[in-house]
Each structure stands twice: as structure tokens, then as C-alpha cells.
């Protein structure tokens, strides 16, 4: 599940984190500096360094911010899930999430990829991201169980891992390559990552095509 940045007033700390997330998405980890965040956030030079003295503290704060936003989104999903939800309804979420993550606004997905890479070398980032993974797996399992599926956190954790891999491929590979290997239909891919972890479910029609542009 992909996080969306919240609208409305935010604290200066959150503003700096949101700005850093945008920079990660656009310029990658190498573009993430204290001065770059200050400039993009429109705050006096030195502000970011006062809040986050080291680069690692910036990255850890970004991961924590994304986790907090994600957990808020998960809570909203819980609150708005209709009682009569079924397996097909749940399956249909994934093509929509994939399209949003790749075509509509890839900022969060691109930043997440950068943070995953940083987490390999930085325990603080790794710990912050683990909260997002655990919250998502738990919420996904609860949602699928509400739809009558015997899903576990392992199933939904695997689903999220599949989703992340597919999203990265769609963002990184040329259209011709995606077409050649059969990864050019976001709708089918969204249904596919769901069905791959819930093999007993005949969810979705599987024959709809959603334009990736």
C-alpha cells in the first residue's frame, strides 16, 4: 500500500521531512543535503541541520515520517472498510494502488526505494521502515480476513513484497521491455500480485486493461 502525504498545516519538522522525501524521489540519495532541504522548504539555511544534525538522522526521520503517514492511511482504511466487503473488492484495490504508485504520483514509491537501499547500511532507517511493513501486513491481513479470506501476515507481507518489486520494475524499465516480458498491463499486474498470495481466490476479471499513462 502506498502512502500519501497529508494536506493541511504541518509542523516545521514534518515540513522538512516532507521536503526531504520529495528530494529523495527526484534526485535520489546523493541529492539529499541539509542545504538542499533548506532551499526547497524555503527556510533559512541551517534550519535542517538544527533539526537533523547528520545525514543519517535525516534519512531516519524520513522513514519515520513515511511510516507515520502510512499508519494513518491504514487507520483510515480500517475506518472506511464496508462490512460487506468481499475478496473481489479487496483484489480491486491493488490495480488502483499500483496505478497511483507508478503513474499518478510516484513520489512516495521512489522515495521508499531510496530508503530501502539506505536501510541496508543504516540500522536506524531499517528500524523505522520495519514499522511500516508490520503495520501494512497486519492491516492487510485484517482486511482480507474481513472479506472472508484465511490470510495471515505472511500472506500479506509477501503480497507487499511482490507489489514493491512490480512497482520498481514499472518505474525503472523501458516500455518495450515491460511489454516483452508481459509487465505492461497494470490492471492485470495488480490483480496478479493479489491472486499470487491468495491462490484460492478467483478475484477480478483479469481481462481488463488499464492504460499506464
Question: What is each of the regions a protein language model found here?
Answer:
Residues 1-7, 150:
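Short, intrinsically disordered or compositionally biased N-terminal tails of bacterial proteins
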Residues 15, 19-26, 72-76, 80, ...:
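Solvent-exposed, amphipathic alpha-helical segments
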Residues 15, 19-61:
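Helix-turn-helix
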Residues 64-70:
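Short, basic, alpha-helical segments at the C-terminal edge of helix-turn-helix-like DNA-binding modules
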Residues 103-113, 120-147, 157:
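Amphipathic alpha-helical packing segments from all-alpha helical-bundle domains
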Residues 81, 119, 170-174:
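Secondary-structure edge/capping motif, primarily at the C-terminal ends of alpha-helices
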Residues 74-109, 156-159:
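Hydrophobic alpha-helical connector segments
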Residues 126, 130, 145-213:
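Hydrophobic/aromatic-rich alpha-helical bundle segments in the mid-to-C-terminal region
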